[in-house]
A protein has these predicted regions:
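Beta-rich carbohydrate-recognition and catalytic domains
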Residues: 1-89, 98-171
């Protein structure tokens, strides 16, 4: 979010108990030390740290990472390197655990090419491209992955129908019906 002529920064706010409004005013969550814009943050908790993946702007654009042990403390440690594995312009980082594995997937929108790139890591520092292992029959922009239970999947099928040709391999290589 941007105020006036200032940089875009990542804010946080809390929803009320009914999820109809926010409580109080949004507060800054993260602003890089260089005070340049940052957008598209996604956070994952691992080994006692919150890992924030975000897009830098105005100073070498790409996906960087910052970590903290206290999410709203304002005390972040920033990585110097870029995490994307392409020279193409990227945004919309999403990070999630690969169920049934000790690995994580970092995906991001290679927006000038209209595609996503998928990378894999066990330590959230070093990533390798795994595009060959991923197939998609849709074209999201700034996608998010949310794990769901088998019961939640069945409720979604009941409410919206099962997509034609749907077959998902879970962490135990089980095909979902």
């Amino acid at each position: 979010m941007q105020h006036g002529n200032g940089p875009d920064i990542i804010y946080y706010a809390y929803a009320n108990k009914d999820f109809t409004d926010i409580e109080g005013e949004p507060k800054p969550l993260f602003l890089p030390k260089n005070e340049k814009s940052c957008i598209d943050g996604d956070i994952i908790y691992k080994d006692g740290l919150y890992h924030l993946f975000y897009k830098t702007e105005g100073n070498g654009n790409g996906i960087k990472k910052a970590t903290t042990s206290s999410l709203t403390s304002g005390q972040w440690t920033e990585s110097d390197d870029y995490k994307q594995q392409t020279k193409d312009a990227v945004e919309g980082a999403g990070i999630f655990p690969l169920i049934g594995s000790d690995k994580y997937i970092l995906m991001y929108d290679v927006y000038m090419k209209g595609k996503y790139q998928f990378t894999e890591s066990a330590d959230l520092e070093h990533f390798k491209v795994i595009d060959h292992a991923v197939s998609m029959d849709f074209h999201p922009r700034h996608g998010t992955v949310i794990p769901i239970t088998q019961k939640e999947l069945q409720r979604l099928f009941k409410a919206y129908g099962k997509p034609e040709g749907f077959c998902s391999k879970g962490g135990s290589s089980t095909h979902l019906n």
